[in-house]
Amino acid sequence: MQAQQLPYEFFSEENAPKWRGLLVPALKKVQGQVHPTLESNDDALQYVEELILQLLNMLCQAQPRSASDVEERVQKSFPHPIDKWAIADAQSAIEKRKRRNPLSLPVEKIHPLLKEVLGYKIDHQVSVYIVAVLEYISADILKLVGNYVRNIRHYEITKQDIKVAMCADKVLMDMFHQDVEDINILSLTDEEPSTSGEQTYYDLVKAFMAEIRQYIRELNLIIKVFREPFVSNSKLFSANDVENIFSRIVDIHELSVKLLGHIEDTVEMTDEGSPHPLVGSCFEDLAEELAFDPYESYARDILRPGFHDRFLSQLSKPGAALYLQSIGEGFKEAVQYVLPRLLLAPVYHCLHYFELLKQLEEKSEDQEDKECLKQAITALLNVQSGMEKICSKSLAKRRLSESACRFYSQQMKGKQLAIKKMNEIQKNIDGWEGKDIGQCCNEFIMEGTLTRVGAKHERHIFLFDGLMICCKSNHGQPRLPGASNAEYRLKEKFFMRKVQINDKDDTNEYKHAFEIILKDENSVIFSAKSAEEKNNWMAALISLQYRSTLERMLDVTMLQEEKEEQMRLPSADVYRFAEPDSEENIIFEENMQPKAGIPIIKAGTVIKLIERLTYHMYADPNFVRTFLTTYRSFCKPQELLSLIIERFEIPEPEPTEADRIAIENGDQPLSAELKRFRKEYIQPVQLRVLNVCRHWVEHHFYDFERDAYLLQRMEEFIGTVRGKAMKKWVESITKIIQRKKIARDNGPGHNITFQSSPPTVEWHISRPGHIETFDLLTLHPIEIARQLTLLESDLYRAVQPSELVGSVWTKEDKEINSPNLLKMIRHTTNLTLWFEKCIVETENLEERVAVVSRIIEILQVFQELNNFNGVLEVVSAMNSSPVYRLDHTFEQIPSRQKKILEEAHELSEDHYKKYLAKLRSINPPCVPFFGIYLTNILKTEEGNPEVLKRHGKELINFSKRRKVAEITGEIQQYQNQPYCLRVESDIKRFFENLNPMGNSMEKEFTDYLFNKSLEIEPRNPKPLPRFPKKYSYPLKSPGVRPSNPRPGTMRHPTPLQQEPRKISYSRIPESETESTASAPNSPRTPLTPPPASGASSTTDVCSVFDSDHSSPFHSSNDTVFIQVTLPHGPRSASVSSISLTKGTDEVPVPPPVPPRRRPESAPAESSPSKIMSKHLDSPPAIPPRQPTSKAYSPRYSISDRTSISDPPESPPLLPPREPVRTPDVFSSSPLHLQPPPLGKKSDHGNAFFPNSPSPFTPPPPQTPSPHGTRRHLPSPPLTQEVDLHSIAGPPVPPRQSTSQHIPKLPPKTYKREHTHPSMHRDGPPLLENAHSS
């Protein structure tokens, strides 16, 4: 005797890996078939897979050996009517299997596994049958869940959605959870909280669109599920009978679809400048057409006295009950109890229109829209008064709320209110046990009092979608101290998925009764006080029981209609845009989640892209924006206009031969089809063509400015458009064109209003109007930074997306295609070179230190203003070869300024990681660094092909364009917010006209800068050369604090105190002796004596990355700086002219300094007295100095090097450069930007692309430091004196290739810590190794 086989465990450790994930890809395909506009996450599909395997286990337990065995098991196990539909699908699959595989689930993989499950081999046809049943159930689950997800206005199906939706479906709950007492669907509090507070106009419109979509589905249910059986059986029900029951429901459906279409079109074509969609005209147009009149006659018919009796008389006709029962189980009860409630829904919906119009009029911010809404309200006054008169007589007696008439649960409304209501009811019931109501129910339906027949006890009933709770009232009963104050006491509860509702006829024992039959065949009978009360309870109970069945009937009906009523389109030979989709003309993204249910295009022909740009079935605003930004890379503007005009002119489909014969016989077979074609194809396509035109002229008018004929053609085309629906869109486009023309002729007018007045302009040595005196040291550093920021912000905001797509700024017509971008690149180049020139042309060491210090102060204000482009311009100048090598200059920069410079440099490290984090953390206005965007665009353009080949056809790679458009979109998000700063026209003009190169060629100029750098600080000099002073005015900085701070204006826009980084302010001493002394008012130079201990400067420069109070633009009340008093009157170079305040009265004055002697044994240049002597014709030579035992730290940290002996890395990356002169130099690099200045670490032309090294960048000349031990590199000995006059500059390597291999420039750090006290009169010599000769 054969041993009985053990049951197969699908989820055991041994078997689970064989099944896990097997069905997920196919289930994704099934989901795409039932809801193509939604997506499913992996958890959801895995959960459906578990349910399907659970179902497979149930089917296999019957040990089927034939298809009839499986069918018998389905009939016994599956609830009605799903068993009938599943069997029909399975039989159809077996028939189709003979020709091809119609199934999505993998039959070929499941068939061999079934042998292992059953223990014996079965016929392949049986496997097909089983898989077909499984696929039908999976499609049913996903269809149900998709409907729920769309109701709550989501676009992705989750595991939680499946649990919630299945809990509301009695059929599926019976199938999968027959033996489970209650299912925990998780509390709805996990979902999004409902929006509270006052709704805006746009909120009202969005909510109404969701409501009307659900309302249209209800109307479809009434017409296609309930009305159709009456219409199709003319023997039982005459046309007059149908009219008496359903009145003008078809007209109401047509109006609702038309209204929704108008509102969707209006929302789609709303101007970006408009405060909200202007839907008033939608209501006004329909109201003037009297389109709402059917509601009044409908309400009169449905609410007239005796309607319910005449309705019941139709159902009591001989054969009527049997006919309705034959349609489906429970259908007769649904018609009797559910249909009358559904027929009231249009009445309540119409009353809602009147309330909505008043709310929209109140919230509207557009005067024209307000007027339209007012006109619509006036036009509907007759309908409103008629409706209110009818309803006041009939609905008042019914005392029904609108929710009682709703067939579908309102998941999108008041989730939190539903949870709150459930919790309140549960708290009011004494003796509650088990899970909370909110864990097994989604919504509260109704409550009331019923009598339990037999015991004749009154019970207070609470009905939810998942539970029916019967309670006894606690009123009137004496309560013991400490007893519960609950109003009700629990008697019993019924799970709605486990009961059957049975109508009971009136008898002598009870009247107005119904029966609840439990699973164990026991039953409970409840009776109501009146027939109307019974009807209300039965309507709610029957709706809960048969809702899923009725929804499935609606889905099946609508699917059949779609298949039968496919719209006839013109021939592709006549109308190119009617060509069917195929892999030869369009490809969609597979792994990208579509937004709002719209597929995302990966590649396509131009014709298909234009078709989807103006698609009749949906609008895709993102695609419109992306297309108009990027189309120039594959299509010219004139071609695009020709294509959209061709798209607009749609021919009607030609009649077939059968149609011609029917027309000859006097029939009109095409009239209905043509009406539908015009309504569902021509009108939406033409509206979307106009929408594209509006976006084009609004956001890309430069196409028309460059081509007058293009604008002429557009205006001619718009002038030919006719039709009432098109009128307002034509007017809108015409107004935009006129506005753009005026702006083009008169120049753009910027009327920007700020909440507070901009800060006053800061002046230093130069005065307004004296532009000839403007220079780096004569202008105020704050105002230099402000005016440069305003200028760079204007340049940044002027760059159009079309200047970037296709890397057109690197190509031949770049002056035409990228004028604004080139302006910005050239300005960046000029400013960086100007900074370099200012530094190296300042020969005197003290003055040069002041210049560098002033530039760092400008950088600090750039940081405060969030001008990242300016910050990296300064970093670029400091890291250029001529400046980077100036060791002696950087040694005298205060450590705090070095820290600022280093932190600015860190922004560009690690692929600009810190910069990107900082950019995301601040609020506009700001000026981002453009180089990153250009680098990303260039990599995207070069790393992706222009076309994709499919079946020998070349398709435009639109995915590549979308990626570029995403980058340009990021650029645009920072182009909207202007700076609240005052333009100083003279300073602005000074920087606009900067031309540091003069008439020199770039190579010549960069050679000059480097040679000048070698002249002022030669390589390994014996003594450092001395030079006379260049400037006659004081070098002392005015600081970076506004001179006249006042509330609201003393701070720059968007101070960095909002940054997430919180570093407390602490002063970094220059040396051990300086740790007790404060910083001077200007960079430490030989002219600056050490300040008194404890004194601080108004110009102390702190890190812009410090804490909230590190900003130098705070008021004096919260500053971290000690007050400094400066003398009034003319400045003097005398040390005694500077007074520092310490405490209240103590003002230390340094003693007078004796004049310096001229002999060679004189002290080092570090003595202030030497420089202060004004009577010396030429500076004396600097004598050698004893070498110090300590080494200076490098300007950048060397902690990351692999070994201390390794050569240091090259200087940091530079911001962008673009040539100022001679167009022929543009082609000298792969990107056609400016070639590198000689000796730089990185060429300026390639600096906008920091991660793309150019093969044309020569290595920088080596600049050995005079401090050999600090570099950890061997220094070549000096064999002879260096003659400065004989230096002609370093050897210049060829641009393309070179045989010389010049080593890279070693890095420096801005954290130079002095190993000796700060410079003062008696300090040590300036140079190390001064005595080595």
Swiss-Prot record:
| Domain Ras-GEF residue range list | 780-1019
Which stretches does UniProt call biased (Polar residues)?
A: 1133-1142
- Keywords linked to the UniProt accession: Disease variant, Guanine-nucleotide releasing factor, Phosphoprotein
Q: Where is the DH domain?
A: 200-390
What would you give as a GO molecular function for this chain, any one? Answer: protein heterodimerization activity
Highest taxon of source: Eukaryota
> What residues bear Phosphoserine in this entry?
S1078, S1082, S1134, S1161, S1178, S1210, S1229, S1275
Extract the SUPFAM superfamilies matched here: DBL homology domain (DH-domain), Histone-fold, PH domain-like, Ras GEF
Changing G434K has the effect of:
In NS4; requires 2 nucleotide substitutions
Residue ranges occupied by any PH domain in the UniProt entry: 444-548
Its cellular-component GO annotations read: cytoplasm; cytosol; glutamatergic synapse; GTPase complex; neuronal cell body; plasma membrane; postsynaptic density
Q: Where is the composition biased (Basic and acidic residues)?
A: 1310-1323
Q: Which residues form the N-terminal Ras-GEF domain?
A: 597-741
InterPro entries per UniProt: DBL_dom_sf (IPR035899), DH_dom (IPR000219), Histone-fold (IPR009072), PH-like_dom_sf (IPR011993), PH_domain (IPR001849), Ras-like_GEF (IPR008937), Ras-like_Gua-exchang_fac_N (IPR000651), Ras_G-nucl-exch_fac_CS (IPR019804)
Q: Which Gene3D superfamilies does this chain map to?
A: 6.10.250.3060, Dbl homology (DH) domain (1.20.900.10), Histone, subunit A (1.10.20.10), Pleckstrin-homology domain (PH domain)/Phosphotyrosine-binding domain (PTB) (2.30.29.30), Ras guanine-nucleotide exchange factors catalytic domain (1.10.840.10), Son of sevenless (SoS) protein Chain: S domain 1 (1.20.870.10)
The biased composition feature labelled Pro residues covers 1208-1217, 1252-1264
Q: Looking at the record, which segments are called Disordered? A: 1019-1103, 1129-1333
GO BP terms in the entry: axon guidance; B cell homeostasis; B cell receptor signaling pathway; blood vessel morphogenesis; cardiac atrium morphogenesis; cytokine-mediated signaling pathway; epidermal growth factor receptor signaling pathway; eyelid development in camera-type eye
* PTM notes: Phosphorylation at Ser-1134 and Ser-1161 by RPS6KA3 create YWHAB and YWHAE binding sites and which contribute to the negative regulation of EGF-induced MAPK1/3 phosphorylation.
**Distribution of this protein across tissues and organs:** Expressed in gingival tissues.
Pfam families recorded for this chain?
A: RasGEF (PF00617), RasGEF_N (PF00618), RhoGEF (PF00621), SOS1_NGEF_PH (PF22697)
SMART domains with a match to the protein in the record: PH (SM00233), RasGEF (SM00147), RasGEFN (SM00229), RhoGEF (SM00325)
Q: What does the record note on quaternary structure?
A: Interacts (via C-terminus) with GRB2 (via SH3 domain). Forms a complex with phosphorylated MUC1 and GRB2 (via its SH3 domains). Interacts with phosphorylated LAT2. Interacts with NCK1 and NCK2. Part of a complex consisting of ABI1, EPS8 and SOS1. Interacts (Ser-1134 and Ser-1161 phosphorylated form) with YWHAB and YWHAE.
Q: Which disease is it linked to?
A: Fibromatosis, gingival, 1: A form of hereditary gingival fibromatosis, a rare condition characterized by a slow, progressive overgrowth of the gingiva. The excess gingival tissue can cover part of or the entire crown, and can result in diastemas, teeth displacement, or retention of primary or impacted teeth. GINGF1 is usually transmitted as an autosomal dominant trait, although sporadic cases are common.
Q: What does this protein do?
A: Promotes the exchange of Ras-bound GDP by GTP. Probably by promoting Ras activation, regulates phosphorylation of MAP kinase MAPK3/ERK1 in response to EGF. Catalytic component of a trimeric complex that participates in transduction of signals from Ras to Rac by promoting the Rac-specific guanine nucleotide exchange factor (GEF) activity.
Annotated protein name in UniProt: Son of sevenless homolog 1
Native source organism of the sequence: Homo sapiens
